Amino acid sequence: MKPSSSNSRSKGHAKARRKTREELDQEARDRKRQKKRRGHAPGSRAAGGNTTSGSKGQNAPKDPRIGSKTPIPLGVAEKVTKQHKPKSEKPMLSPQAELELLETDERLDALLERLEAGETLRAEEQSWVDVKLDRIDELMQKLGLSYDDDEEEEEDEKQEDMMRLLRGN
């Protein structure tokens, strides 16, 4: 005889077996034990929490109860204002010393040589040369010197020579 098809279906949906009182009590005890284990470990605040993470090189863990060692002022202290030091200005050179520095300036000489050779300078270089040449002119006027001193002397000598020739000396 063939088993009926209804029996095969009932095997899959068979009722769950009822638990005994002892099994129910054991499960309740397990749940209670799990519930007690929730949360942080006892004393975790005083112990410093997890010691595994953090500093690797230190042997003794740092006690979190110990605070900062920086002193705290207890009274009202007057504010100490820091005095700003003025930017040190370049030492003032005498006009003669400054003129000598400008005349021996290698960059200025190189740029002037390039100008004499017919090269065109960049705008930045040209403005720098103009500023330096203007400063040289100012210093020479201050000192009572001029570029044309040598040329004037030569012209004066030529005129004197001409005068001598005309006089017949």
From Swiss-Prot:
Q: Which GO terms describe its biological process?
A: ribosome biogenesis
Q: Ranges of Basic residues compositional bias?
A: 10-19, 31-40
Q: Where is the composition biased (Acidic residues)?
A: 147-159
InterPro entries documented for this protein: YihI
Q: Where is the composition biased (Polar residues)?
A: 49-58
GO molecular-function terms, A-Z? GTPase activator activity
Q: Which intervals of the chain are annotated as region Disordered?
A: 1-99, 146-169
| Bias kind Basic and acidic residues: ranges | 20-30, 160-169
The alphabetical list of record keywords is:
GTPase activation, Ribosome biogenesis
Which cysteine residues pair off into disulfide bonds?
A: none
Pfam families (alphabetical): YihI
Q: Describe its assembly.
A: Interacts with Der.
The record's function comment reads: A GTPase-activating protein (GAP) that modifies Der/EngA GTPase function. May play a role in ribosome biogenesis.
Name the family the entry cites.
Answer: Belongs to the YihI family.
Q: What is this protein called?
A: Der GTPase-activating protein YihI
Q: What is the lineage of its organism?
A: Bacteria, Pseudomonadati, Pseudomonadota, Gammaproteobacteria, Enterobacterales
